[in-house]
Amino acid sequence: MIIKEYRIPLPMTVEEYRIAQLYMIQKKSRNETYGEGSGVEILENRPYTDGPGGSGQYTHKVYHVGMHIPSWFRSILPKAALRVVEESWNAYPYTRTRFTCPFVEKFSIDIETFYKTDAGENPDVFNLSPVEKNQLTIDFIDIVKDPVPHNEYKTEEDPKLFQSTKTQRGPLSENWIEEYKKQVFPIMCAYKLCKVEFRYWGMQSKIERFIHDTGLRRVMVRAHRQAWCWQDEWYGLSMENIRELEKEAQLMLSRKMAQFNEDGEEATELVKHEAVSDQTSGEPPEPSSSNGEPLVGRGLKKQWSTSSKSSRSSKRGASPSRHSISEWRMQSIARDSDESSDDEFFDAHEDLSDTEEMFPKDITKWSSNDLMDKIESPEPEDTQDGLYRQGAPEFRVASSVEQLNIIEDEVSQPLAAPPSKIHVLLLVLHGGTILDTGAGDPSSKKGDANTIANVFDTVMRVHYPSALGRLAIRLVPCPPVCSDAFALVSNLSPYSHDEGCLSSSQDHIPLAALPLLATSSPQYQEAVATVIQRANLAYGDFIKSQEGMTFNGQVCLIGDCVGGILAFDALCYSNQPVSESQSSSRRGSVVSMQDNDLLSPGILMNAAHCCGGGGGGGGGGGSSGGGGSSGGSSLESSRHLSRSNVDIPRSNGTEDPKRQLPRKRSDSSTYELDTIQQHQAFLSSLHASVLRTEPCSRHSSSSTMLDGTGALGRFDFEITDLFLFGCPLGLVLALRKTVIPALDVFQLRPACQQVYNLFHPADPSASRLEPLLERRFHALPPFSVPRYQRYPLGDGCSTLLADVLQTHNAAFQEHGAPSSPGTAPASRGFRRASEISIASQVSGMAESYTASSIAQKAPDALSHTPSVRRLSLLALPAPSPTTPGPHPPARKASPGLERAPGLPELDIGEVAAKWWGQKRIDYALYCPDALTAFPTVALPHLFHASYWESTDVVSFLLRQVMRHDNSSILELDGKEVSVFTPSKPREKWQRKRTHVKLRNVTANHRINDALANEDGPQVLTGRFMYGPLDMVTLTGEKVDVHIMTQPPSGEWLYLDTLVTNNSGRVSYTIPESHRLGVGVYPIKMVVRGDHTFADSYITVLPKGTEFVVFSIDGSFAASVSIMGSDPKVRAGAVDVVRHWQDLGYLIIYVTGRPDMQKQRVVAWLAQHNFPHGVVSFCDGLVHDPLRHKANFLKLLISELHLRVHAAYGSTKDVAVYSAISLSPMQIYIVGRPTKKLQQQCQFITDGYAAHLAQLKYSHRARPARNTATRMALRKGSFGLPGQGDFLRSRNHLLRTISAQPSGPSHRHERTQSQADGEQRGQRSMSVAAGCWGRAMTGRLEPGAAAGPK
């Protein structure tokens, strides 16, 4: 739901406005009623006494809007649904109107209006709730300044030119509002609160925005201009005169609409019945209250709402079968919306119910007749100048955090620019759908970018709070390359001669042919050059802006259906290679194969028919990097060149030998060129007339923007990821493969680290890419993107290519050897993993959804339709390998799968060498099954609209671009998480030596996880150090203590300011006035001098709480690691911990490591998705860490009165657990059994998977007894929303980790939720190693917002 408050000042009194409004409504009703498809019927007009606003007039109208909505949307609606029913309650100066539509039950427009004698300064006319205020956008409409579409502009309706002959008012200046307020002239304002709701899958945001921008705002601008400029017609009229005009208008409307009624007699009776009516207007004879006092009774009761279902009985429209089919379509996707959460399908907060009491009472009749006025092709208009948003700005996803007052140190540089808060820049290359006509609608492109920006903001506020303000979105409009192809193919349709058979004509359009024709056009090359130029311009504008001036983060591209093709080819054209790190997905690639002929056959065709000159004719005959072989030489002159090796230079004539492919035989290259010529001849026969009549470089004008290099230009920045939304790129590349059989598609490597091809399986525009890179992938389903409603932080399934190859070993071997004729360099082996290539939703530390809950899902009785099998099994056990499923087969982990032998090393290396990145490329999104029954012509528009508003897409994108530097619980209850802002500004250090000591060192602060009873002391202790080994102590400096008392959405409460002692320690006892009840509360201590901080939690528990203790190194780690490398995780460990947490036990993690490693260890726990719990460390380096563990556990038992239920560890921990009087049945030891300890503990010999099965099925694990504790403890995981730089910045992109094995045979173990069979929770070594091996404490940038911890 989109909620906007329009404020429309007018230079008249409230009473004059009433007359003007009534006159304008009846006049527009006469002028704009044409019959079926466009017109108004008045069905009921009666007074009411106990309704909205007290007493007034109720009116029931029907608007026929079939001519005013887009054809693709009209094709999916039943004919009876092409009408809008209006119910209005008018108690002037308060009115309320509600619009609904038959057969579209999830659609409504509620408009509530107050008319006040001010200029729009009233801050809260409607007394909105906090939830509604958060969603509200205030939009001022100025009848003078706001632009009007050219096709609607009339000189006589221009307030800047109009002057009344009766009143001598006008013309109005651009600052007329200020002038009228100063001179005390009459002025009033219409406050209109408009709520638009269209709760249908995939279309909600686009349709709601469409209604607001075109059906409401544009109509209101025009109507109020007319109300002012028509004052010579209505000035001096009385209410009696208005009533007579309304009667005449109603009779005229009834007669005109009756001509199109199939039942003439019924229509005649309708005319007679309406003619007898005394009240013919939507307004009451006299207002019940005109003194301007607030009117009571705003709630809309049931008896006030008359049913609009009677309109379904109208005999107009198609046959009943057509009605039932269309109605079923809409109900199907509406049902899908009902089964999902509000976050996915509509923007309304869950507190906003569907009850009528929650709808605002809106604008009355102002925009009645113009509700959907001529919106088939809306004119672009800029309405942002007068738009005052209470949310995020235009395309930037940011939080409204006040700038902090920075007091610089004496030695600081006063002119140094602060670092940019933006860490990720998303460039949206918007090209529209393949069915778009003309140049496209700029406002629609801008609206889509706004929609996805709002979805980013919504998702981040709930589950990724520290990402707020760190991500920026910029729009790059793309040329409509498919419009000419669409026009051509439309003319070829067998139904092209019959304009009345629109749906039949468009259903016969071969959609797959459109991108093939578009990319084969000679104009396509210039379109790619235009995209590169516009992207560079957008990036340059961002760098010049204040927020991007010091930007040093990553840049990602998002390409839609058409924009994705242009983005891919622009990346292939780009002659700026990615750095040759071990982790680069382009390492060893054949960059020289990115020649223009591989991108568009039309380019070679153009070059072959051109004379010399022009730098290669915009790329024909030259290389992609410039410096072509002979400028504009024809194809014949280059026949002797072999395109299978690096004979054509890219930029300066030199090329790294590592970038060469094995040289092919000359006969192969000859065959390749012959094939090109054959294709040229075929295309030339289609375009011969064009090529013969036009000069050589028909489109060589683009070379002026390419510096005469003969190439299409390049991006001025590095690009890390390319995201494609429903893009038919696979078809385009398949055509190029067909044209040039010797071409391997993998050779067309885009200049980015990873390609993500997101699509809906039912989208006719989409196609897969993976089978083009490796044929055997056609047998594997695309990776199913988890639903945001179920798994807001991801379901833990691995997207790594190496895991897919290992898991589906048998499937790959069944389908034989790779099909690519070219052999990838075998010397490369398997690329070493890097942070950029592995920090996916799999390795993202924020994916903390419980893995055991996935494993425990029972299969439902599902339909056997392909789309259900593909899309509806997101969390269910997959069917047999022969049945397509959303995730790899055999998701249920089994020991047999874990021990399955891997593919031969050469095979893995060969497939990986051809891959565009190190993760899966094809990703399937959820869509309702009912969409398969929709008309084909409607699907491209519908699916294209769905990507921008999909929370599935946005959460997936966030997981790919995030990295994490600190830890926190991430709740899964859907509540918004409060954003932390330091309560105190930065100050000078208390000691002059401090700023010298802290040079070139990073903070390593930590707060001990605290445990307390409700009635006992609640003490917080922390230590503030700098350097990974605590080399510098923060002595005598201020530290501010903050706590969140109502997590996760509560406010951060400032408690006190402490001063560190000589060892950097602070201790704080929470006072009685702020004593905490049972629960888990985030704690944050911020250093006043530099705003670095530490995070922790205090857990308040009742006495008798039961807990389960785990030794981190003893029970979880499968390898030994002291500092530098990432310990491997024992398979199934996460699921065992999760099992105990689900039973209601408090989780305690103990380790003998020093507290200086807290950030690293907690980050490692989060990296592997462990449930949240209390973590205990030693106080510095101690001689006997086992004694520390025992003493800590004894303290919990003796002083806090907690009870140990079970304990896990290694053989070294047996003595610790025995010291706290645990029985052998409560001690579980991981490792090889020893005779000495056989009677003292239970050994887990068959792994955690078998142990978990025993716990579940032998009833050895009972639920915790203390129900109060179970309600208080959160079931979240360690999540890492991080602080300032949790997003990957450019200097981290190509970093590799030495602990990562270089060969594919070295694979670390994974937990059961990370096992091969389930592929859940596989975690890359590289990111965890980065977290494990370096300090993670963040720094609050000036004005930055850090997520709560």
From Swiss-Prot:
It is a peripheral membrane protein. Residues 262-344, 618-671, 876-900, 1296-1326 are annotated as: Disordered. Keywords: Calcium, Lipid-binding, Membrane, Metal-binding, Methylation, Phosphoprotein. It holds the Pfam family DDHD. Residues 715-963 form the DDHD domain. The gene is PITPNM2. The lineage of its organism: Eukaryota, Metazoa, Chordata, Craniata, Vertebrata. GO terms for cellular component: cytoplasm; cytosol; endomembrane system; membrane. This is Membrane-associated phosphatidylinositol transfer protein 2. GO terms for biological process: phosphatidylinositol biosynthetic process. InterPro entries: DDHD_dom, HAD-like_sf, HAD_sf, LNS2/PITP, PI_transfer, PI_transfer_N, START-like_dom_sf. Belongs to the PtdIns transfer protein family. PI transfer class IIA subfamily. It comes from the Eukaryota. Transmembrane segments: none annotated. The modification Omega-N-methylarginine is found at R828. The keyword Iron does not apply. Residues 653-667 have a biased composition (Basic and acidic residues). Interacts with PTK2B via its C-terminus. Interacts with CPNE4 (via VWFA domain). Residues 878-888 have a biased composition (Pro residues). The modification Phosphoserine is found at S337, S341, S368, S589, S644, S700, S701, S702, S1277. It comes from Homo sapiens (Human). GO terms for molecular function: calcium ion binding; phosphatidylcholine binding; phosphatidylcholine transporter activity; phosphatidylinositol binding; phosphatidylinositol transfer activity; receptor tyrosine kinase binding. Residues 618-631 have a biased composition (Gly residues). Residues 302-322 have a biased composition (Low complexity). It is found in: Endomembrane system. Catalyzes the transfer of phosphatidylinositol and phosphatidylcholine between membranes (in vitro). Binds calcium ions.
